[in-house]
Amino acid sequence: MASVFHYFLLVLVFLDTHAAQPFCLPGCTCSEESFGRTLQCTSVSLGKIPGNLSEEFKQVRIENSPLFEMPQGSFINMSTLEYLWLNFNNISVIHLGALEHLPELRELRLEGNKLCSVPWTAFRATPLLRVLDLKRNKIDALPELALQFLVSLTYLDLSSNRLTVVSKSVFLNWPAYQKCRQPDCGAEILSSLVVALHDNPWVCDCRLRGLVQFVKSITLPVILVNSYLICQGPLSKAGQLFHETELSACMKPQISTPSANITIRAGQNVTLRCLAQASPSPSIAWTYPLSMWREFDVLTSSTGEDTALSELAIPAAHLVDSGNYTCMASNSIGKSNLVISLHVQPAQALHAPDSLSIPSEGNAYIDLRVVKQTVHGILLEWLAVADTSKEEWFTLYIASDEAFRKEVVHIGPGINTYAVDDLLPGTKYEACLSLEGQPPHQGQCVAFVTGRDAGGLEAREHLLHVTVVLCVVLLAVPVGAYAWAAQGPCSCSKWVLRGCLHRRKAPSCTPAAPQSKDGSFREHPAVCDDGEGHIDTEGDKEKGGTEDNS
């Protein structure tokens, strides 16, 4: 009887002991340390922070796991947690309330995650936090008040991130730094503020001037883990140590030009120059009245530190190029504008260059283009500027020998588009625009060709996204056909198609590569003008068809 009672007593003791043993997650290790109970989970497939952790844990280590966020209320039952290590996970987001219910937290280590930013105000909930390890993340900015709520912080590691520019105010606003700058701050505290900032891609321009000065003059209570901070940019500073770098103060762009008022003859080349001095280096852009229609080459170069020169080249200037050209320079500090006035005077008729679009016997500048496909054809758009003060009417001529189509449209003032409908496949068309009562002239015409019938809906869909090949533009048109339009002037001396279309010449276009919706290139018959008014396609050859080019 005594032996039975003794056995029963042992069972009760065993059950009581195991009932009191705290729960440990499967695959993890729980242990008792000098500071309390520890949970360590390494290379465990945890998609989120477990919500059933015991409040008896003083340290939690979850490392090399697929954690991707720290959601709000992650540690609601762990008010006594002091050490939280979440190194080498995939955490990219820390929610604002993630650190709530952790008033006793002393260490937060997040090394080797994917954080681009940190909700710094979340540290209001952790007034006792002393160690914050954020190295090897993707943090690219520090707000000036980032450390405002880290009142007890003594160790901050931001090394191996993507910081380029940081204000010295970040550290001047650090409460622990301010406290230890007081005259009565003890020597014991003076050596306790440790910061790691190395291995970041620092851009050593004027915006980093304050931090560079701070690092140069750093003394206790701040200690840098690695004081050899290196500039990665700009190119003139790359490789220099902070201690070797002298940076100027920031300033908004100041613009100058050799000449703000330029007068030239039509047909002459002219280059407008704009010199901008700024720190950091400025970006420069040009605006002018006809920028949507006439694009000029712009060359911007660096002539020295914090100095940029921009040159806008206008070849063979037209009368319509007269006007104000605005050079705009901007940087992070501000922007400035400079206006250059260009006056283009008429050239003598006998010496007018061939490249001018204004005919000697006319008095208008006209730029005619095929701009897009419409439901039933194409859309023409033009810029027309008459050399008179009165409102001018224009005449649009549309013709095709193959389609036996000749159309004359009278265009009133203020209209600059016209839709050409009911186009036939495999046909070349030409459109010309001139002043009312005048015949079309060289430089005012545009030729376009519709492709052969491409078949079903799928074939037509593949032609909606195309590439530009030299001066040729592929356009989808109804019933699966497609067209290219020569954007340059027609070479005919008279407004007749026969001279252009029936002159013998080699194929004048290269195979174009239509793009599908996914951006890949698909094989498609190339459309070429063989000089005899018909369209030759590679698709015909695949079908075994032949064309008589003799």
Swiss-Prot record:
Q: Which residue pairs form cystines in this protein? A: C274-C327
Q: Which residues form the signal peptide?
A: 1-19
* LRRCT domain mapped to chain residues: 200-252
Compartments where found: Membrane
Annotated PROSITE patterns: IG_LIKE, LRR
Keywords, A to Z, come to: Disulfide bond, Glycoprotein, Immunoglobulin domain, Leucine-rich repeat, Membrane, Repeat, Signal, Transmembrane, Transmembrane helix
- UniProt feature, compositional bias: Basic and acidic residues: 519-550
Which residues get glycosylated? Answer: N52
Annotated ranges, domain Fibronectin type-III: 361-451
Query: Where is this protein primarily located?
Result: membrane
Q: Which GO terms describe its cellular component?
A: membrane
| Family annotation (InterPro entries) | Cys-rich_flank_reg_C, FN3_dom, Ig-like_dom, Ig-like_dom_sf, Ig-like_fold, Ig_sub, Ig_sub2, Leu-rich_rpt
Regarding the membrane, this protein is recorded as:
Single-pass type I membrane protein
Q: Which residues form the Ig-like domain?
A: 253-341
**Name of the protein:** Leucine-rich repeat, immunoglobulin-like domain and transmembrane domain-containing protein 2
Q: Which organism is it from?
A: Homo sapiens (Human)
Starting at the broadest rank, the lineage of the source organism is: Eukaryota, Metazoa, Chordata, Craniata, Vertebrata
Gene expressing this chain: LRIT2
